[in-house]
Amino acid sequence: MASVVPLKEKKLLEVKLGELPSWILMRDFTPSGIAGAFQRGYYRYYNKYVNVKKGSIAGLSMVLAAYVFLNYCRSYKELKHERLRKYH
Amino acid sequence: MNENLFTSFITPMILGLPLVTLIVLFPSLLFPTSNRLVSNRFVTLQQWMLQLVSKQMMSIHNSKGQTWTLMLMSLILFIGSTNLLGLLPHSFTPTTQLSMNLGMAIPLWAGAVITGFRNKTKASLAHFLPQGTPTPLIPMLVIIETISLFIQPMALAVRLTANITAGHLLIHLIGGATLALMSISTTTALITFTILILLTILEFAVAMIQAYVFTLLVSLYLHDNT
C-alpha cells in the first residue's frame, strides 16, 4: 500500500523501516536547519522539565548527569588503564 | 601516577577539533532567561540570587561605577558556575588554564585603570603617593606603588588559576591515596574523611569568585570613583 501521507511530513516513529534512509537524507542539514534542531530539542526538554509549575531538582540533575557521562566518554581513553586488574 | 595526575588539565580536543569551546559555553545553558513577571522555580531562584549579589556588590558605587553592573554580574556568574561544574567527576574546568584567567583579568583591570586616568587624571596619579610620606622616601615609594599597580592583573589571574588547580590536584591525590590504602585499611576511614572535608572546603570555590570579583571591584572603585 503506497503511503498516503508524503514522506516529508512524517514523524520518525511513523516512518517505515524501508523508508528510513530516504527519510534521513531528506532532513534539513543546512546550518540553520541544524541550529533549528538544537533549538527545538532544547525547548522540548526545557518545557517538559524546567518550565513547569512545580519544577524539581530532577530537571537540573539530568543535565548534569548527562554532562558527567559525556565527559567520561571523552576521557575514557586515559581512564582505560585504571581498571581493576592484578597486573598493570 | 605521574602522567595521570595532570591529564585532567590538558585542553580537551576531539579529533583535532576544540571541544573546549563547547565546555566553556556549557554553563550558559544553565541560566535560562524569562521575561515573565512570575516564572518557573528555577528562573525565580536565579533571579533572586542575582538580585542579592548585585545589590550587595554594586551599592558602594556611584552612578558611573554602576554602569559596570552587567559586566561584573556576568563575571561572577561565569566564574562561579565554571568552578562548581569543575567539581563534578571527570569534568574539565576552563579556569584552571592561566591563559583564560589572564584573558579575563587584564582587559577588566586595564579598563578600570584607563577609565580612571581619562576621567580623573589628577586623582588617579595621586594614588601613587600615599598621604604624609616623608620627602626623601618619595621616589622609592612611587616606584613601589607603580609596581604594585601593574602586578594587580597578574595577581588576579594567578590567584584564580592557582587556587582552582591546587584544589583539583589535591582531590586527585587524596582520592588516589584512599584507593591505594583500601587494601591496607585502618587509615582508610581517616583519609576518606579528609577527602570529604577537602571537598567541602573546595566548594568554597564559590568564595573564590567572591574574592575575584571583589578584588576587581575594589580596584574599579578606587580608580574610577574615589
UniProtKB/Swiss-Prot annotation, chain A:
UniProt KW RNA-binding keyword: no
Question: Which locations, inside or outside the cell, does it occupy?
Answer: Mitochondrion; Mitochondrion inner membrane
Pull one GO CC term from this UniProt entry. Answer: proton-transporting ATP synthase complex
Does the keyword Glycoprotein feature in the UniProt annotation? no
One biological process GO term for this chain? proton motive force-driven mitochondrial ATP synthesis
Sorted UniProt keywords: Acetylation, ATP synthesis, CF(0), Hydrogen ion transport, Ion transport, Membrane, Mitochondrion, Mitochondrion inner membrane, Phosphoprotein, Transmembrane, Transmembrane helix, Transport
User: Which family does the similarity line name?
Assistant: Belongs to the ATPase F chain family.
- The protein depicted here goes by the name ATP synthase F(0) complex subunit f, mitochondrial
